Amino acid sequence: AETYDVIVTPKDEAYTIFAQSMDRTGFARGTLAARAGMMAAVPALDKPEPLTMGDMMGDMSGAMGAMDHSMHAGMAAAGASTRVRHARTEYGPSVDMRVDTPRTNLDDPGIGLRNNGRRVLTYADLHTVGGPMDKRGAGREIELHLTGNMERYTWSIDGLEFGKSTPVHFRHNERLRVILHNDTMMTHPMHMHGLWSELETPDGRFQVRKHTLNVQPAQRISFLVTADALGRWAWHCHLMYHMDAGMFREVVVA
């Protein structure tokens, strides 16, 4: 669901643009060329990689060694200093794990892309030219947790699937900070319709402006939003089967 603007100065030859699925069962390709009919070589698919607990939990430096997946609590992350609070609604059948000390770094390539011999673009590499659109600081904060139960295959926010949830309310033209905390072992690209999300570094500096923000397993991110568009907006995981299973909220700007 993410989009990127890329500026290139091509030579008089063809270039393959190649995207492969996470499970390496297929790919999509396009050709950038100076004229119709030019073709370039298509790379081979990478070999499938089995996902380990470390892959799914984002290289938490051994903190998962004593984890019992039937318990799902108290999982420590290297480098994290602040424990978090979980909503009461997270303690129910829709949530099978909670991350108490998430990681906050933005330079992890993600599942299946670590140490593969190629340079991989991360959020730490991205910088929006010109800085934030709104120079105001945040007037308030909202923290939400991305939650799920992998055995039941339900996905939710703060332990509530969409049908059980109430809208998130933004005041018109306010500037606020949103904190997303991933309590699952899956990556969730969160897309907020109608409004821009301005990602911050762990120490609160502006990094990049996005409409969809990828939240990795056991990760905590924060971003600033200016609620300048009146109306009712969808906010959901852009893995559509996660959205359909409940990881969806309505945002009301009024």
Where in this protein do the model-derived segments appear?
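Asparagine-centered strand-capping/turn motif at beta-strand->loop junctions
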Residues: 180-184
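Short solvent-exposed loop/turn micro-motifs enriched in small/polar/acidic residues
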Residues: 1, 161, 205-206, 218
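Short, surface-exposed beta-strand-loop junctions and turns on beta-sheet-rich folds
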Residues: 23-25, 185, 196-198
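Divalent metal-coordination and catalytic microenvironments
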Residues: 1, 144, 178, 193, ...
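Histidine-centered divalent metal-coordination motifs
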Residues: 18, 188-195, 236-242
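Intrinsic, low-complexity N-terminal interaction/targeting segments
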Residues: 157, 166-168, 189-192, 196-213, ...
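Short strand-edge motifs at loop-to-beta-strand transitions and within beta-strands
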Residues: 2-6, 211, 219-223
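Extended terminal and domain-junction accessory segments
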Residues: 2-175, 228-232, 240-254
